[in-house]
């Protein structure tokens, strides 16, 4: 089967924005105008086509990037048919993993901003992610019909907050309830959309008299931006004082692809105005798969040679699995972006990350939650495969004879964890299966079993992230679960060397028990030693027989697991068995194991024991206005500020080390201090001694019989 649309007429774009900028509504309109959905889905009714998980429709936020294919030939059918693959991305800070994941497979992006709220914190995070993957982008200012809408203020905010270089190619006619359409600066005509056909039809008209000067000023700005694309265009502009429509589009396109400028449009998706012109801009200014840098990877040879794959059907097959979803009807759906070659239904592919060969069952083209079976996918396509068992997010799929591993995505480690248990014992196995599947879909979510308590611990990127996981377990797998409070994993250690006797003697009728040891406990530098515990013996003259050394070691290690001070695992100790005695008849392994355990317990309390707490490396990015409040708050949380950097757009990056115990609820506090404009990331740095006043509270609770981990 030959290719239906030439690859030069493909556009793989992401639509991303801050929560409530109207991104899902914008995507809905795209599907409506391109003829994919016949009834417009409104988020207000919880019926949006792209938001297809139940939680999304309930909460009115987008969690998973659904990928959709649609076709567009221009507002006035002025283009041949183009194929647009749209990936809708979430706008909540706990889901940046989804944004990062979709940015990785896009060729271009459309940033949606609210005409009232402007550039908000998540917009800044998404902008940085788009910079990281060098994604060319355009901006759409939505909600022009809302009270307080101001297009030109958003243009300024893009410059100051994002360090962007926006070039408007339309200006709004009116604003708030008088918003009626836009002036197209390339055509220098007003565009008025027909309300009866929900904006399907439009007509060009004269520019309103009161807007002529504004339009002329912004047109000059746009033409100058286009002229800077090349010396040739600049010479033409200087000679003629203007550029033709074709030259303007060519100049703006070249600079957009080089990420030097961002073409900017506006409208109201809800009122069916402006999205149509934005679709034209996607075709005019965003790249096809052949216009972005060829994907790079590593070959399967001794030297791990770097190689690239051109976006062509003739090249060997290579694709990246960027999302895995569990579907009630077909099981695992693996979303892939094909970079090169062709894949047919039933073909075998090789996964170099897992060193496994797998066969593709069906290939489906997704339209939000509707699916259409197709026979093959080619370079530039985005589709979902059914039947892949061992693929996880970020894996490469390629031709078995031409193995290449495309660059892997990096996923942050989880920062919050809590215990979860099924409400009924019968659900235990169902819960394990559910958590396993969810962890496969989402690499930023982890599951493990706590060795001490036997509890199942789930870890993720934030409180909302884990809420939604628990919610999905209930809905998709029918498992009701109880969740514990967020926990900190403390550790215990010693600061000085001590020698301690340990004796275990039992004399009842018949055979007795006898174990007697002297153990020296020394502080061990975990980093230098490369281990958390070491056992040695310096026994002279056989006072403790060799066969009992292992038992003493075992007794000490078992005691270390559950701590002495506050019930947390002990680390950083070297135990040396140096003396003792035994009894020919009564000594056995158990006696020496108990003697070792007692020696450790008593010696530990004399060796200046301390509690260690996890310290996190925290980085807060905040506009300068809120810096004082944020620094003050970090100090109150026992944080140590390590340094500061200046970022574009007057943003400051504050780097600090803060105990994890002080970071619960931080996201909410930080958002309220900065009116939602600061963002933060945190990762584990090291363990450090807990200050005495904090440690005393934790120890007292443990000694009073309170459970460890309930450190509120």
From Swiss-Prot:
Any one GO biological process: ribosome disassembly
Span of domain tr-type G: 8-290
GO cellular component assignments: cytoplasm
Cellular location(s): Cytoplasm
Disulfide bonding pattern of the chain: none
Keyword annotations: Cytoplasm, Elongation factor, GTP-binding, Nucleotide-binding, Protein biosynthesis
Chief site of localization: cytoplasm
Protein name in the entry: Elongation factor G
């Amino acid at each position: 089967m030959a290719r239906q649309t030439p690859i030069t007429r493909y556009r793989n774009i992401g639509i991303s924005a801050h929560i409530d900028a109207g991104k899902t509504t914008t995507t809905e309109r795209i599907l409506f105008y391109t003829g994919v959905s016949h009834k417009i889905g409104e988020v207000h009714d919880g019926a949006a086509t792209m938001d297809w998980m139940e939680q999304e429709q309930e909460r009115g936020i987008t969690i998973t990037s659904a990928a959709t294919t649609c076709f567009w030939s221009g507002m006035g059918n002025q283009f041949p048919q183009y194929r647009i693959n749209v990936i809708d991305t979430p706008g909540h800070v706990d889901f940046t993993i989804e944004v990062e994941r979709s940015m990785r497979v896009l060729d271009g992006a459309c940033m949606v901003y609210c005409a009232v709220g402007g550039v908000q914190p998540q917009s800044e995070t998404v902008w940085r992610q788009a910079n990281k993957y060098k994604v060319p982008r355009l901006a759409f200012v939505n909600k022009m019909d809302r009270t307080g809408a101001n297009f030109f203020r958003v243009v300024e905010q893009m410059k100051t907050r994002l360090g962007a270089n926006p070039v408007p190619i339309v200006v709004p006619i009116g604003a708030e309830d008088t918003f009626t359409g836009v002036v197209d600066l390339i055509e220098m005509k007003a565009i008025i959309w027909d309300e009866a056909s929900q904006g399907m039809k439009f007509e060009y008209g004269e520019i309103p008299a009161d807007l002529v000067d504004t339009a002329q000023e912004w047109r000059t700005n746009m033409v100058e931006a286009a002229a800077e694309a090349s010396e040739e265009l600049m010479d033409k502009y200087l000679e003629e004082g203007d550029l033709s429509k074709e030259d303007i589009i060519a100049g703006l396109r070249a600079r957009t692809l080089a990420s030097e400028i961002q073409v900017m449009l506006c409208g109201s998706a809800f009122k069916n105005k402006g999205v149509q012109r934005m679709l034209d801009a996607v075709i005019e200014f965003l790249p096809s798969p052949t216009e972005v840098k060829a994907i790079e990877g590593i070959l399967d040879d001794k030297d791990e040679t770097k190689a690239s794959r051109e976006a062509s059907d003739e090249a060997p097959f290579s694709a990246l699995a960027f999302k895995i979803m569990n579907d009630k009807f077909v099981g695992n759906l693996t979303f892939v972006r094909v970079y090169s070659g062709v894949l047919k239904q039933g073909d075998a592919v090789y996964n170099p990350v897992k060193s496994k060969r797998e066969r593709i069952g069906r290939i489906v083209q997704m339209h939000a939650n509707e699916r259409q079976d197709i026979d093959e996918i080619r370079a530039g396509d985005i589709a979902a495969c059914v039947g892949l068992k061992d693929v996880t997010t970020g894996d490469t799929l390629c031709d078995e004879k031409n193995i290449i591993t495309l660059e892997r995505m990096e996923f942050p480690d989880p920062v919050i964890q809590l215990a979860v248990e099924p409400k009924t014992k019968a659900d235990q196995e169902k819960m394990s299966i559910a958590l396993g599947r969810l962890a496969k879909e989402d690499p930023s979510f982890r599951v493990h079993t706590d060795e001490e308590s036997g509890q199942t611990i789930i870890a993720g990127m934030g409180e909302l992230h884990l809420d939604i996981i628990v919610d999905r377990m209930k809905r998709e797998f029918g498992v009701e679960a109880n969740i514990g409070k967020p926990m900190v994993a403390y550790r215990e250690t010693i600061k000085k060397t001590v020698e301690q006797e340990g004796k275990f003697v039992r004399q009842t009728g018949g055979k007795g028990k006898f174990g007697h040891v002297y153990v020296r406990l020394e502080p061990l530098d975990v980093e230098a030693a490369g281990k958390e515990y070491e056992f040695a013996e310096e026994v002279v003259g056989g006072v403790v027989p060799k066969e009992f050394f292992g038992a003493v070691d075992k007794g000490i290690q078992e005691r270390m697991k559950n701590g002495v001070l506050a019930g947390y695992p002990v680390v950083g100790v070297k135990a040396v068995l140096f003396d003792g005695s035994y009894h020919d008849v009564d000594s056995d392994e158990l006696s020496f194991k108990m003697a070792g355990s007692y020696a450790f317990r008593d010696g530990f309390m004399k060796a200046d024991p301390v509690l260690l707490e996890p310290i996190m490396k925290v980085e807060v990015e905040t506009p300068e206005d809120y810096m004082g409040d944020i620094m003050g708050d970090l100090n109150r949380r026992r944080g140590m500020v390590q340094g500061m950097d200046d970022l574009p757009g007057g943003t400051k990056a504050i780097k600090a080390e803060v105990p994890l115990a002080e970071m619960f609820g931080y996201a909410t506090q930080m958002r309220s201090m900065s009116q939602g404009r600061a963002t933060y990331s945190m990762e584990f740095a090291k363990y450090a001694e807990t200050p005495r006043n904090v440690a005393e509270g934790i120890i007292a609770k443990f000694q009073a019989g309170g459970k460890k981990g309930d450190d509120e």
